[in-house]
Amino acid sequence: MPNEAFENVLLNQRQFFYTNSNSNPIYQSDVYLSEIAGEDQSTMSLPKFAVVDMDGDELPEVVYQRGDYMGFIVLRYKDGDIYGYDVNYRGLTGLKKDGSYSTSSGASNTSVGKMRFLGELFDTDVKFSSVEQETVSYYLNGTEIDEVTFNQLWDEYEKLPDVDWYEYTESAVKEWLPHYFEAREAAISYEYHSTPMQDYLDSLSDLLYNDYSAHGDNTEDEYNAIFQNSYDGWDQAMATIYTLCQDKLTGSAKDVLEAEQQQWLDMREQMALNTPIFLVTDMTKMRTYDLISLYFEDHFYD
């Protein structure tokens, strides 16, 4: 059961499969939490943990917050095993009870989204964002918006209730994990918990591995080849799920989808004229996630 598996990992009685996609190449290994937490001894603050459903599948994850500026490890239960995903400290801030969080790579490069799991990797499914190039642009679901709308969305996000953080102690682990899981166990079959949508997302994991291969010491030509390959892959993935949505929908719902998709494609074409290809690729990936949610009737942001 997840409660026992998470407890054993948090108390260093069991290894988990750890992925650090920030390293190059991607680092993956079976480890004890103490092997990673041992790197955090210089921090002034104590580690904490929270329990929250990060991806909306009704099965909570456990988020282990390392010390100051040390980042996070998101622990996920799948098929009887625990998987751990390393997230840098600016990649998961302001975590809310609905799984929303913010990321930042600079004062004017900020996004708010939720987490998607693709195989043994994770990604942030961005709801809205600000992107600084020569000027700052703002986006909602991949469509450009104005600064006023962005600020309204940000205010709404900040008003969401924060997750409850607990000090990382043995007594707290044993007290609070059952609190989150026992009530759910009667309603959900945890042993091999999955959904058709999750299986579909997992089938796209190779595309995400390719994206992360750009985190390295490459020549300009190598970077361009990686980015183009990534764009081509996500563009094909988007086209595939769009066709599935077309086949599923009928009547006015199908008409609305087709109009929205054409509008989105026109916007992407215009944006690509003066936007780096990796940003256009990110937009395409986010549109793919939106279409996946539509096809599987997943209300990810409701």
Where are the language model's segments positioned?
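N-terminal alpha-helical modules
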Residues: 180-181, 186-302
